Amino acid sequence: MAAPTPSNRIEERSGHASCVRADADLPPVAILGRSPITLRHKIFFVAVAVIGALAWTVVAFFRNEPVNAVWIVVAAGCTYIIGFRFYARLIEMKVVRPRDDHATPAEILDDGTDYVPTDRRVVFGHHFAAIAGAGPLVGPVLATQMGYLPSSIWIVVGAVLAGCVQDYLVLWISVRRRGRSLGQMVRDELGATAGVAALVGIPVIITIVIAVLALVVVRALAKSPWGVFSIAMTIPIAIFMGCYLRFLRPGRVSEVSLIGIGLLLLAVVSGDWVAHTSWGAAWFSLSPVTLCWLLISYGFAASVLPVWLLLAPRDYLSTFMKVGTIALLAIGVCAAHPIIEAPAVSKFAGSGNGPVFAGSLFPFLFITIACGALSGFHALICSGTTPKMLEKEGQMRVIGYGGMMTESFVAVIALLTAAILDQHLYFTLNAPSLHTHDSAATAAKYVNGLGLTGSPVTPDHISQAAASVGEQTIVSRTGGAPTLAFGMAEMLHRVVGGVGLKAFWYHFAIMFEALFILTTVDAGTRAARFMISDALGNFGGVLRKLQNPSWRPGAWACRLVVVAAWGSILLLGVTDPLGGINTLFPLFGIANQLLAGIALTVITVVVIKKGRLKWAWIPGIPLLWDLAVTLTASWQKIFSADPSVGYWTQHAHYAAAQHAGETAFGSATNADEINDVVRNTFVQGTLSIVFVVVVVLVVVAGVIVALKTIRGRGIPLAEDDPAPSTLFAPAGLIPTAAERKLQRRLGAPASASVAAPD
């Protein structure tokens, strides 16, 4: 019998559903639902829209009275429901047009290591864990300096119209190209010049991003035996889950999930007990350098081992902790009804001289929030690990669009944890030590002089706040993570345990942050490896073999290159806190958003190439907005005459002090620190220029290719020919009645996937 082709697609309609077959002699590979929207559904969505509009009205226009945090949660939730049901559906029907009778890269290239068809629930867990890192936790906390209103609008609306769209569509074009990386797709679709720029620039950006994320993990876990023990235990638990699903009970995802959740909760609770034992404190209180080497080793192992053994189950397991904690915080908001202490729009939004970060609301609020609304890093995951695990094209909507929507909600909750804090305490936590001298008395004097609303803070108040969470001081605990932990403790102790458990919740939050961010390190390493393989393979010769995923020596070599790159920067940052990775922190947000510009450019061009010019506005509008934000921010960072904003102006001031033989200048307290600032600002300014040049080259190439395509003379679409699928799997996280019926007929575990017999 001849191999079936996509043209053999057969639809058998029954009521509001159709069974799709790739071959008449094989079982169905998909169920297409065509259920109309009933009156009950219409009433529900109208009610959601009305409630959402009311909530946004309260959030935006009630300025002269306190605003309850519940309103922001309600506004966000209603917006997500409408966005996923209607806007994501529009994109699916008009742009993506998924074909579940087409085999995905995981089915075609199934190699048991990188390409593995995986249950959609596990893929969703892996994908969410991989994309949700430091950005949605730290960015909104820092952006609270500008006020809660612009931050909440951008996090929610920006995600629905930009971030979710980017993730969904990058996943789509990668799946249609055998899971190719973003850099390779730039080369294939936009030409060699843009491709070289992307294949060189993107790995540099991703190396910086992974190193920054890893440093946040190291700082959170240093001298924290509870966190180290609990996170270490997730590794054997994940390996057990992977083997359980692979060999013992294939397809029993719900079963292994219950076991994994139980073991995870045991690891979290027992971590507190272990930390208070003599042997636990000795074994798990690790120095930053030791943690670096352990993290580097883990990153390499996670990228080498088969994806089903460690990466996917560990990310899936971590998702339960992530989503569970965020859900608990959301319940805490609804139960405690905390009042938002931050102003709707602060005076720092216009002045641009806030103590947390310098710069005006536009463009730096959008740069600071970063992954909470739009993230270029996500494009690497959507063209890295996720397309190589996906069972069906129909699952892309819930995983790509839904995964980013979930992360946006994480950012909303993170924003609220900072916004409900007394603003004097918020700025005490986030003001640079240059202004506070790490003293409660000096900090109180400084923040009381900022012109904040509310009662002035006293040194005793600051000391009591630190003691309530088991810390010696909370003064100048910059970076956002300590503020998030403090806000989480403030929220959770009101719901569970009272004041007596506030310190417990604070240290739990520290562990949660490390676990939350670590999953992006391992997935990012694997995604970066794919990009390095694609980039080097373009040189031809023996390097061409690197693009073959089955060539293990090449895969291992690329993994070593990636881990060595971010690992060396991580070690530099830990051993040299005034330089190294800290140099790259201000670049994190801009680089991430510039990467999103590259991804949206490729998406827009592909949509035009596929003859869907009418719908090119869907990725095109987010692209124009992202370019306006990032290029403006880059211009200011490169050319601003304000030394608190412009890299080169700051470089010139410190270089002048260096040449004058000064021993202290600005934030530098000695000559060595002055030298560090001179070096760091040079690196920052240079990388800013490089990143902008890369993005401009890609965008210009995209415009040229798009115009040629419209005129009928463009580069051909680099999409692989489809192959027929023999695998059935439900499209959504929850199977429909028709899908369940087919599953029972095929004899597979409830809601699992099943392959046609050979």
UniProtKB/Swiss-Prot annotation:
Keywords noted in UniProt: Cell membrane, Membrane, Peptide transport, Protein transport, Transmembrane, Transmembrane helix, Transport
Segments passing through the bilayer: 42-62, 67-87, 122-142, 153-173, 198-218, 225-245, 256-276, 291-311, 320-340, 361-381, 401-421, 498-518, 561-581, 588-608, 615-635, 687-707
Matching InterPro entries: CstA, CstA_N
UniProt keyword annotation of Transport present: yes
UniProt cross-references to Pfam families, sorted A to Z: CstA
UniProt GO BP: cellular response to nutrient levels; cellular response to starvation; peptide transport; protein transport
Subcellular location: Cell membrane
Keyword Magnesium tagged: no
Membrane topology designation: Multi-pass membrane protein
Annotated GO CC locations: plasma membrane
UniProt similarity note: Belongs to the peptide transporter carbon starvation (CstA) (TC 2.A.114) family.
Biological role: Involved in peptide utilization.
Protein name: Peptide transporter CstA
